[in-house]
């Protein structure tokens, strides 16, 4: 691991403040990053003071004046070069993601691949950023719309995808002509510093204005500074619903924009017409992948009563084959939770299930002993519950899968939608009418609705986000880029008269 840290220029003590070209040690508290894999100290980071933050934002303001004037395809070419850098460091960065966050090495590498993919997407986007033309009711007039850069984009990212979500926002914002200030999770600061180190050579070689890529490591207060800062027209925040409400209220109070990607309480409906050999692996990966710490993790399984016992038995067998341990070992399926607080949340949730009368098809357990020295490893469990129970309505970031029976598809969809969150959903069925009903206006109310695949593992080509307490924001693909720009409608008169719209007469 030390060789990887050296390659990524991660030291025992690290500078947590950067304007892209310059870096320095913040005047705030020192943050220590411990690996949930083995409990060992990876490194420390000097976090930001308010003065450090203001310096980064001030530099970003100056950089925007120049960056917005660079042609979008040129900005896209710079992003292309960044994608090449991430290809070069994919193994090292993916390994650090796995070690600092705790997800499997395959998932860590996959997260870096997401950065590469969004870079590729953004390069093509840089030659589009299209507006529309409209026909004017007035003779010798032309109407169209165009999109302009917005300014500083504040990015608040979460620990579970410590680098991918940053890239979804940043690469699109950059080709749109914006500049970025990134507040990474204080639980995974070293991966953020590694990303800044990786792109620094590209910034320098292209004479990119200092301040285009800002990094401010710190705690909750940094997020509060971003949210209240009128110099930051857009704040994109990923995290809990509680955090998102605070950000949304603060940004909304100053009439700024917020892009919120918050909690999920995702369900899969398993129809009596499902292909179970196809469904079971998707359910298991959705429930235990990243130790249940994805926004799109499968939390609830809504099973037709006629196949309930069969599905439960298949899942119990599959869970019995799961290998839990060091995520850097490719033979293991499940790594640790992020920290001891997450373990306590897991324990509290399973205790509530028991208190409400729930039963466990696969028993919960906190793992100790050889290989589990960090205290962050838990056994994925399966509980039989009722959908209306408060603990089932709540998102617990842990590998707990709730089983729920249904009789009719209408009932299943009502159960699926019957939670405060609305991120991801899925149905397994070979019945065309069931699939189409699930995808219809009367079907899933989530931002993501899948058929015959699970709730997690979204590609970057589609817009990512959800409804209700998930926040309503959209990141990544499709036309999510529009959130990072300001729309302008233009009317051009190339005639010699001045007719007014709606036939209004005004003569002087």
Give short role names for the model-derived ranges.
Residues 38-43, 207-208, 269, 323, ...:
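Conserved C-terminal structural/oligomerization subdomain of aldehyde/semialdehyde dehydrogenase
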Residues 1-38, 365:
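Hydrophobic face of amphipathic alpha-helices that form TPR/SEL1-like repeat modules
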């Amino acid at each position: 691991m030390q060789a990887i840290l050296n390659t990524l220029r991660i030291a025992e003590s690290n500078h947590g403040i950067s304007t892209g070209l310059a870096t320095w040690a913040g005047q705030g508290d020192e943050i220590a990053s411990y690996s949930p894999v083995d409990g060992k100290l990876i490194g420390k980071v000097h976090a930001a003071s308010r003065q450090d933050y203001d310096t980064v934002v001030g530099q970003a303001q100056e950089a925007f004046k120049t960056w917005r004037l660079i042609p979008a395809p040129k900005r896209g070419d710079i992003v292309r070069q960044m994608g090449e850098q991430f290809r070069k460091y994919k193994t090292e960065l993916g390994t650090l993601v796995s070690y600092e966050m705790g997800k499997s090495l395959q998932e860590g590498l996959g997260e870096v691949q997401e950065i590469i993919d969004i870079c590729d997407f953004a390069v093509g986007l840089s030659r589009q950023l299209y507006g529309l033309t409209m026909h004017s009711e007035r003779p010798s007039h032309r109407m169209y719309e165009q999109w302009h850069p917005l300014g500083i984009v504040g990015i608040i990212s979460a620990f579970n995808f410590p680098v991918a979500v940053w890239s979804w926002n940043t690469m699109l914002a950059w080709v749109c002509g914006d500049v970025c200030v990134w507040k990474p999770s204080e639980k995974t600061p070293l991966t953020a510093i590694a990303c800044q180190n990786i792109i620094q050579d590209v910034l320098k070689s292209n004479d990119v204005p200092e301040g285009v890529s800002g990094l401010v490591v710190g705690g909750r207060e940094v997020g509060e500074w971003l949210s209240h800062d009128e110099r930051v027209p857009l704040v994109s925040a990923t995290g809990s619903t509680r955090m998102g409400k605070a950000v949304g209220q603060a940004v909304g109070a100053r009439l700024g924009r917020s892009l919120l990607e918050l909690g999920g309480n995702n369900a899969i409906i398993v129809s009596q017409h499902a292909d179970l050999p196809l469904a079971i692996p998707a359910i298991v990966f959705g429930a235990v992948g990243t130790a249940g710490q994805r926004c799109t993790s499968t939390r609830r399984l809504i099973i037709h009563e006629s196949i309930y016992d069969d599905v439960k038995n298949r899942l119990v067998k599959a869970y019995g084959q799961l290998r839990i341990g060091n995520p850097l070992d490719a033979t293991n399926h499940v790594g640790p939770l992020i920290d001891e607080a997450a373990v306590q949340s897991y324990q509290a949730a399973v205790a509530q299930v028991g208190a409400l009368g729930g039963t466990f098809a696969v028993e919960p357990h906190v793992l100790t002993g050889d290989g589990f020295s960090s205290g962050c490893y838990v056994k994925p469990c399966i509980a039989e519950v009722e959908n209306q129970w408060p603990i089932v309505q709540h998102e617990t970031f842990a590998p707990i899968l709730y089983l729920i029976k249904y009789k009719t598809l209408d009932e299943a969809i009502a159960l699926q939608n019957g939670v405060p969150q609305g991120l991801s959903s899925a149905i397994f069925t070979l019945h065309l009418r069931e699939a189409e009903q699930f995808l219809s206006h009367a079907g899933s109310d989530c931002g993501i609705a899948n058929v015959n695949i699970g709730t997690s593992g979204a590609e970057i080509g589609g817009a990512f986000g959800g409804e209700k307490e998930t926040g309503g924001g959209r990141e990544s693909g499709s036309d999510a880029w529009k959130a990072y720009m300001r729309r302008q409608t233009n009317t051009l008169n190339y005639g010699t008269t001045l007719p007014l719209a709606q036939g209004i007469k005004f003569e002087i």
